């Protein structure tokens, strides 16, 4: 009869964090093999299993005994804290089996049961320090040569990884964490945030927030996990946070913007990272000249330092400061009614965007610019000097007006400009488009926008709740006809303010109208086409 090996990771040690499959595997086993402290941690889950517990450095003998017992027909649970496949017993058990010529099809059955690793459990107590690329390094040289561990620390420090050190120190092994700190300080600021977590989610749990230069002033032991941040990690209200990326985007009138669920974390949701902003190269020639001067100065200093190092016979490494690239986003157009770009405007766009920026024409009669810069004011000044209308991008209010037949049907233009003056660029729960057409032809499709107004026979017709995307898209519901020109601006303004106040984050206007049933006195009617259409993957 073939036995079975259950290699179990039981997480940080608290019952609440042990997975259901791990509990079941412990219950179905005949024998438990593990480090004696780990056996004690799961004592409450044991029934009548035979127990074999050994010391800290006896991993190989535990793996060998487990294989032996499984080959004798027993169901054997080999336990590890955290995840069995991360510095746990899974690899050693496989190695022992491979040495014995084990084959998956014919040998004893083996199941590896995952658990919550220390990097994850400790990160949850610290805040969110592992939100970007990270690595784990064990400082135990029991099974790995210290020279190899040193190389890995050096590489991780240079590459600006968040680093989680496992097994940082023991009673007899004390110098490794000191050496790790020394290597990290070659590349990272002494003020780099560090989190020390001892016995996560256990009775003697301790969490300490410190920094790279002071971390050794605190107690660090075998049960401690040391989490070292990268160059963008910061502390906030006793939390350790690493932003999701090194690129941030911002637009005209917002320092913070609501985060769309389907997008990566953007600068608008990273107000904490402002202090870490570093200038990037600019497109403008004057800025380039200043940058070149700085580069020449830096190069001269580097040569001098290199010569000094050669004389002293020393080698030093520069601290890594990963630049956080700031991307300025803005939408430009010749105007609300004017759809014609001048040669001067096109030349200005090419100049301010430069080689690293991008220009994207949008369906909103605008060109969206994305420009790497630390000086948006200079860009804004140049664009305004070229008579561009500038608008923020994102979840904001945008007017999409027709050209009013090249200005010949101009009666609705003053109302369009007044709405832009009052509401243009206002933050919204979700991007909101107001279509304005100057005659009953509505050839620019105002009725296909979230809100549409059409000037006809000296008055305005009002449309609400168009579904603008999807195969079941439809025009807005006509809720009023013949609105007096003197009233239209106030009516639209009140509708938009009601949506801004009561709309849920990321809720499109047509969904809002359907949910609340009445907006500023206008009742909702379901005019959705009665066809069965699969929902869009994006949820719209």
From Swiss-Prot:
GO aspect biological process, one term: cobalamin biosynthetic process
Return the protein name.
Cobalt-factor III methyltransferase
Which CDD domains does the record associate with it? Precorrin_3B_C17_MT
Report the function annotation for this chain: Is also able to convert cobalt-precorrin-3 to cobalt-precorrin-4.
Alphabetically ordered keywords of this record: 4Fe-4S, Cobalamin biosynthesis, Iron, Iron-sulfur, Metal-binding, Methyltransferase, S-adenosyl-L-methionine, Transferase
Q: Which reaction does it catalyse?
A: Co(II)-factor III + AH2 + S-adenosyl-L-methionine = Co-precorrin-4 + A + S-adenosyl-L-homocysteine
Please state which protein family the record places this protein in.
In the N-terminal section; belongs to the precorrin methyltransferase family.
Q: Which organism is it from?
A: Priestia megaterium (Bacillus megaterium)
Question: Which gene underlies this protein?
Answer: cbiH60
């Amino acid at each position: 009869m073939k036995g079975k090996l259950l290699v179990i990771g039981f997480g940080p040690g608290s019952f609440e964090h042990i997975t259901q499959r791990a509990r079941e595997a412990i219950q179905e086993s005949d024998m438990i093999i593990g480090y004696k402290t780990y056996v004690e941690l799961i004592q409450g889950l044991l029934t009548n299993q035979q127990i074999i517990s050994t010391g800290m450095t006896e991993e190989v003998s535990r793996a060998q005994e487990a294989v032996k017992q499984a080959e004798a027909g027993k169901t054997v649970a080999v336990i590890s804290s955290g995840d069995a496949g991360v510095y746990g017993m899974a690899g050693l058990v496989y190695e022992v089996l491979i040495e014995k010529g084990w084959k998956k099809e014919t040998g004893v059955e083996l199941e590896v049961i995952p658990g919550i690793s220390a990097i994850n459990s400790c990160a949850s107590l610290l805040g969110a320090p592992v939100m970007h690329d990270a690595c784990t390094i064990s400082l135990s040289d029991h099974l790995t040569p210290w020279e190899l561990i040193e190389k890995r620390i050096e590489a991780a420090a240079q590459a600006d990884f968040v680093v989680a050190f496992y097994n940082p120190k023991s009673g007899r092994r004390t110098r490794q964490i000191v050496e790790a700190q020394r290597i990290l300080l070659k590349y990272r600021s002494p003020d780099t945030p560090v989190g020390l977590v001892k016995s996560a989610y256990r009775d003697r749990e301790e969490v300490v927030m410190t920094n790279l230069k002071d971390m050794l002033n605190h107690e660090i032991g075998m049960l401690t996990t040391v989490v070292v941040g990268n160059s963008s990690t910061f502390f906030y209200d006793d939390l350790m946070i690493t932003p999701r990326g090194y690129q941030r985007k911002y637009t005209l009138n917002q320092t913070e913007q609501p985060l769309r669920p389907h997008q990566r974390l953007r600068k608008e949701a990273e107000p904490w990272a402002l202090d870490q902003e570093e200038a990037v190269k600019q497109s403008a020639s004057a800025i380039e000249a200043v940058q070149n001067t700085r580069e020449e100065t830096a190069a001269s200093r580097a040569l001098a330092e290199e010569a000094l190092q050669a004389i002293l016979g020393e080698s030093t490494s520069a601290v890594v400061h990963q630049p956080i690239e700031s991307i300025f986003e803005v939408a430009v157009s010749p105007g609300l009614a004017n759809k014609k770009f001048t040669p001067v405007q096109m030349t200005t766009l090419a100049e301010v965007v430069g080689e690293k920026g991008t220009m994207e024409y949008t369906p909103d009669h605008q060109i969206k610019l994305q420009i790497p810069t630390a000086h948006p004011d200079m860009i804004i000044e140049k664009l305004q000097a070229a008579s561009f209308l500038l608008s923020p991008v994102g979840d904001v209010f945008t007017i999409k007006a027709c050209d009013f037949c090249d200005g010949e049907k101009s009666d609705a233009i003053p109302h369009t400009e007044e709405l832009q003056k009052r509401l243009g660029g206002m933050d919204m729960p979700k991007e909101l488009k107001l279509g304005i057409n100057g005659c009953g032809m509505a050839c620019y499709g105002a009725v296909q926008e979230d809100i549409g107004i059409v000037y006809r026979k000296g008055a305005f017709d009002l449309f609400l709740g168009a579904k603008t995307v999807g195969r079941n898209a439809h025009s807005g519901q006509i809720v009023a006809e013949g609105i007096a020109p003197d009233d239209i601006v106030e009516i639209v303004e009140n509708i938009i303010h009601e949506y801004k106040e009561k709309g849920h984050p990321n809720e499109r206007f047509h969904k809002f109208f359907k949910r609340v049933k009445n907006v500023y006195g206008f009742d909702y009617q379901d005019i959705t086409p009665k066809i069965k259409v699969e929902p869009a993957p994006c949820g719209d």
